[in-house]
């Protein structure tokens, strides 16, 4: 493990005191945080969590910390991390939390603790400009559309000024502009130290800043992507750290499943062909025969890729994901074998070119990797993986995802560190960490569970309407729309309506039509950041959204006074990954619904409902329109997990609650019915 280089003055006073004692002093009523931070208020839960985190920094091990909203968990782990003197890796599930830590919390703590430390904010490689690839694209003679030329000029102007190469600095570059994929610093295109632009490489600079930093902030996508690349022995950017803190840890299983799998897509084949044509157009070789042969093979590979991915489309069932097996892939064998053969010829021809450049060697490596991955996918016989076809717009992906990532998370992410803290507002089910322990491979761990600091009996009411049909009913969407119309009349808009699927959202949107007297914002009509900005600024707005708005959203005050959830968020048993995980549980004699689907749905539901009460002054209505929470036996598990807000089945109680001044919120609402 790489040796840490802590800032020398991190611990200059009271060396005889333990870290736990110094952290306790920082959080004391008369401590430095209380004296310097205007919004600081002593919270018992925050102190307890900070002490538990400090114990990990002193003694090692793993800590599972569930800290309800309002606990102040971010400061509870940042203060011990800063004071520990170790290099600490902090990974978050959302960009919002990354931004909060780097731009708000760390500067405030630097002043409050009077401690000098350095921090680096790291993003995934795809966020950074590759100077070498950009130079090739800019100087090539490829035909470009006017809009592509305009975007390239925007990047060109910015590239001469930026110190970081982070595309987030370019306000005029849309998130989904295709040209960025050609010039970003993704690992499969990286030439490493052989790159002519290596000394000026933005990714190399970022990694050097991280090596020299005490606190390194990443997100789960970079954490897992980097660990997966590290296994293949090239391209990692995160330096070794003694300790890690994984916030929003409930998201880690899904992200790890994505990055520790294998995927081959029509995009990757198209990009390989495009990059090869561009390189050949530069006349970088004195071997014209091999160059002509390579042109032929590239064209052949493109044609065979079109045939192969076109044949895959025949397997696509209803929905975006379709499970495949060695049997269902059999009709594609010939097309896949021809594509594999072309990739093999591609690689061999590149290797035979005399005086080939580093760029050509990188292309050969990419072709070999695609060849190996296609062979693995074609066999589709590894019992540890689930194989499926995924369609995303024009993208066609053949994937193999690990069914169980617990050993991967344990061995590749957690055991690399002397100590790790996994924290979230939602880690326990039925009062136990057993579910998350099993999913993330956490065998031995310390545990701490801290309730929310908010007074839900005063700040919220839970509305469960009695007359809703079952979600499978043809009347469900129209009933949701009717219920929304009546509920939003009481709340005067100011609501998130969160749906478990786009199909449900679209059906309710169509039912609502123009009947709502409030501004209606719909996911998909504009970028996520635009919708959030409009919701915060347009009075009485209503937002209809799906999964991406269930987590990581913070709208304070009366702007958001109601969160409506249409259905209990069960993962679809038709989803290939869900189905495979349920089969594994069933094969060992377990109950996949009780052991997997219900716990996962409970954590997801709590995240969705958690959008409402974010601060002590927030008040509002939590509305769940799924009758199964009342009528099914498993509904009791959901009810027991919900915040302790009063429950009502009547809109008149909701109106009374909203009309009641703060601190009298539960006076005229029913007692809790749990």
Language-model region placement:
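Conserved helicase motor "Helicase C" RecA-like lobe of SF1/SF2 P-loop NTPases
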Residues: 500-524
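Conserved RecA-like ASCE P-loop NTPase motor core of nucleic-acid helicases/translocases
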Residues: 88-96, 421-423, 493-500, 623-625
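Walker A/P-loop NTP-binding motif
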Residues: 54-55, 74-87, 104-108
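A substrate-engagement module of RecA-like helicase motors
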Residues: 2-36, 86-214, 221, 276-292, ...
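Conserved pre-motif I regulatory segment
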Residues: 13-65
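Signature of the SF2 helicase/ATPase Hel1-core->accessory helical subdomain module
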Residues: 83, 99, 107, 187-189, ...
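Conserved RecA-like P-loop NTPase helicase motor core
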Residues: 453, 461, 465-475, 520, ...
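A contiguous, basic/glycine-rich beta-loop/short-helix subdomain that forms a polymer-engagement track
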Residues: 181-216, 227-235, 339-468, 475-482, ...
């Amino acid at each position: 493990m790489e040796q840490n280089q802590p800032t020398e003055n991190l611990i200059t006073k009271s060396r005889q005191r333990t870290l736990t004692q110094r952290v306790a002093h920082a959080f004391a009523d008369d401590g430095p945080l209380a004296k310097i931070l205007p919004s600081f208020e002593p919270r018992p839960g925050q102190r307890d969590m900070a002490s538990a985190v400090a114990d990990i920094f002193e003694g090692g091990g793993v800590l599972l910390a569930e800290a309800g909203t309002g606990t102040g968990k971010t400061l509870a782990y940042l203060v011990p991390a800063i004071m520990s003197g170790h290099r600490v890796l902090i990974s978050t599930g959302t960009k919002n939390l990354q931004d909060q830590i780097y731009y708000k919390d760390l500067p405030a703590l630097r002043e409050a603790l009077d401690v000098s430390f350095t921090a680096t904010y790291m993003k995934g490689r795809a966020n950074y400009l590759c100077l070498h690839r950009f130079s090739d694209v800019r100087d090539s003679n490829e035909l470009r559309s006017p809009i592509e030329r305009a975007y390239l000029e925007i990047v060109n102007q910015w590239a001469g000024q930026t110190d970081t190469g982070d595309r987030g600095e370019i306000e005029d570059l849309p998130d989904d502009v295709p040209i960025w994929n050609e010039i970003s610093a993704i690992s499969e295109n990286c030439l490493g130290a052989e790159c002519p632009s290596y000394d000026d490489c933005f990714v190399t600079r970022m990694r050097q800043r991280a090596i020299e930093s005490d606190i390194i902030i990443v997100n789960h996508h970079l954490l897992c992507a980097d660990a997966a690349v590290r296994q293949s022995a090239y391209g990692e950017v995160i330096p070794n750290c003694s300790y890690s803190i994984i916030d929003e840890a409930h998201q880690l299983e899904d992200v790890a499943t994505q990055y520790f799998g294998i995927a081959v897509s029509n995009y990757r084949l198209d990009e390989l062909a495009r990059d090869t044509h561009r390189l050949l157009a530069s006349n970088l070789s004195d071997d014209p025969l091999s160059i002509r042969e390579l042109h032929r093979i590239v064209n052949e590979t493109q044609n065979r890729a079109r045939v192969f991915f076109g044949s895959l489309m025949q397997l696509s069932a209803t929905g975006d994901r379709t499970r495949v097996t060695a049997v269902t892939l059999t009709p594609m064998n010939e097309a896949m074998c021809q594509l594999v053969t072309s990739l093999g010829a591609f690689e061999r021809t590149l290797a035979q070119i005399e005086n080939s450049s580093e760029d050509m060697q990188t292309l050969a490596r990419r072709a070999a990797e695609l060849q190996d991955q296609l062979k693995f996918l074609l066999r589709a016989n590894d019992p540890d993986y689930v194989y499926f076809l995924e369609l995303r717009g024009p993208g066609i992906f053949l994937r193999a995802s690990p069914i169980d990532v617990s050993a991967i998370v344990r061995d590749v992410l957690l055991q690399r560190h002397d100590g790790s803290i996994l924290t979230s507002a939602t880690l326990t089910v039925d009062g136990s960490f057993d579910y998350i322990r099993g999913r993330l491979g956490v065998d031995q761990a310390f545990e701490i569970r801290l309730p929310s600091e908010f007074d839900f009996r005063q700040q919220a009411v839970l509305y469960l309407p009695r007359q809703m049909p079952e979600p499978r009913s043809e009347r469900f969407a129209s009933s949701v729309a009717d219920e929304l119309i009546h509920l939003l009349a009481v709340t005067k808009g100011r609501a998130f309506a969160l749906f478990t699927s786009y199909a449900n959202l679209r059906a309710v949107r169509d039912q609502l039509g123009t009947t709502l007297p409030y501004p209606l914002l719909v996911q998909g009509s504009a970028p996520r950041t635009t919708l959030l900005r409009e919701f915060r600024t347009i009075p009485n707005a209503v937002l209809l959204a799906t999964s991406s708005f269930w987590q990581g959203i913070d709208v304070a005050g009366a702007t958001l006074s109601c969160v409506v959830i249409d259905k209990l968020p069960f993962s679809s048993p038709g989803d290939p990954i869900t189905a495979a995980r349920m089969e594994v549980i069933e094969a060992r004699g377990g109950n996949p619904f009780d052991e997997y689907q219900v716990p996962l749905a409970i954590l997801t539901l709590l995240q969705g409902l958690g959008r409402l009460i974010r601060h002590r002054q927030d008040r509002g209505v939590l509305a769940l329109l799924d009758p199964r929470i009342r009528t099914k036996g498993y509904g009791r598990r959901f009810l027991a997990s919900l915040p302790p807000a009063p429950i009502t089945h009547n809109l008149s109680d909701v109106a009374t609650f909203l009309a009641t001044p703060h601190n009298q919120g539960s006076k005229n609402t029913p007692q809790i019915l749990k």
